[in-house]
């Protein structure tokens, strides 16, 4: 009987961590993210387990264990972050996992009220701030901001390396940041399409005119296409 009484606080802490982690994960699951209900519940529960085990073996070390948990979650969060061209996806999901670990730490320490308050705030951040971010994205772009552009040029495949180097020199001259450079076979046989991913000032007209006018002087280039990256 005494052993059961001793186990009750341990189980209560783990259940609280699992439930609050699942609550955070439910929102991620609803939005069809990679790390959903189960992942967040397990992260919170695991963090609570580490805290509880450290308190059992060395009651003075939960702070040190909490710091180790933060480092460990970094590896897990990196697994949900993906780069697609110039776009990075999964940052919010990784941050949510990090927060779930924090909830688990609070539950492991028995700070249930703090854990519940933090869970509510995390959910508000993921739900309410999402709407705010979408509204901000719909506002006119600041002239002082940056935009992403896609520049595509088509050339004969034998001239690809020369055109690539020439393109790099022009981009450097235009003082615009090159984020990526690659090539794929063009629709016309024997030709290559070189794709440059650029980041520059939102007022891009002068930069675009400079790049296109310089490219137009190269006889090896048969087609040019400039567009704003809408992703």
Curated annotation (Swiss-Prot):
It is found in: Cell inner membrane. It is a multi-pass membrane protein. GO terms for cellular component: plasma membrane. Keywords: Cell inner membrane, Cell membrane, Membrane, Transmembrane, Transmembrane helix, Virulence. Gene3D superfamilies: 3.30.70.260. The keyword Transmembrane applies. The chain crosses the membrane at residues 5-25, 39-59, 62-82, 103-123. Pfam families: MgtC, MgtC_SapB_C. Signal peptide: none annotated. Virulence factor required for growth in low Mg(2+) medium and for intramacrophage survival. May be involved in regulating membrane potential by activating Na(+)/K(+)-ATPase. Belongs to the MgtC/SapB family. This is Protein MgtC. It comes from Salmonella choleraesuis (strain SC-B67). The gene is mgtC.
């Amino acid at each position: 009987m005494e052993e059961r009484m001793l186990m009750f606080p341990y189980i209560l802490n783990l259940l609280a961590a699992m439930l609050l982690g699942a609550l955070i994960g439910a929102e991620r699951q609803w939005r069809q993210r990679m790390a959903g209900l189960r992942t967040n519940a397990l992260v919170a529960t695991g963090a609570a387990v580490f805290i509880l085990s450290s308190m059992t073996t060395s009651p003075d070390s939960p702070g040190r264990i909490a710091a180790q948990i933060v480092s460990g979650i970094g590896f897990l969060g990196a697994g949900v972050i993906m780069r697609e061209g110039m776009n990075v996806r999964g940052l919010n999901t990784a941050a949510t996992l990090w927060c779930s670990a924090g909830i688990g730490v609070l539950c492991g320490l028995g700070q249930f009220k703090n854990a519940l308050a933090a869970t509510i705030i995390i959910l508000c951040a993921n739900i309410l701030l999402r709407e705010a971010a979408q509204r901000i994205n719909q506002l006119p772009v600041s002239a002082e901001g940056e935009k992403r552009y896609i520049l595509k040029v088509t050339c004969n495949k034998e001239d690809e390396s020369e055109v690539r180097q020439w393109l790099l020199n022009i981009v450097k001259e235009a003082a615009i940041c090159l984020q990526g450079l690659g090539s794929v076979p063009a629709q016309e046989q024997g030709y290559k399409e070189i794709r440059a991913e650029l980041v520059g000032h939102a007022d891009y007209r002068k930069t675009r005119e400079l790049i296109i006018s310089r490219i137009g002087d190269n006889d090896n280039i048969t087609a040019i296409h400039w567009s704003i990256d809408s992703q």
